């Protein structure tokens, strides 16, 4: 799972921002890093920043990424104003899925199950919280944030023959600003 490149706008100013120049450069770097794998399956969140991050690798492999809502970013609660979304997210990131309630526990479980049920080696372009949801689901850790994943970091999971998912490698961490 790859976190998208840096977005051009923050969570409190845009619902679906594109990548900025640095984000586009990060996308090319991760594509160059993964090019030799030559897998046959790419999945991306429907959000622009993930689709744009997937483009360089998909082009190298001559693939069309499959857009899946199952790997989308955590939804903000209904009724939270755009300008208040970042405050909600930063507060949520300090706690657990259980603190947020059953809707969010279900989000974590659904994204973990989706990844667990993928049968072939796949690159998934997704989001900070979504990738952490899978990490937590695999490790049995209820915290929203387990890894401070940098933009375009690569987190590797492995699925065994019986369908068990394990964390092989956490992505590169940084003091990522959630904006």
Where are these regions (language model features)?
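Active-site-proximal alpha-helix that buttresses catalytic centers in soluble enzyme cores
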Residues: 1-68, 91, 95-100, 145
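Acidic, low-complexity terminal tails and accessory targeting/binding regions
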Residues: 63-67, 73-85, 120, 136-179
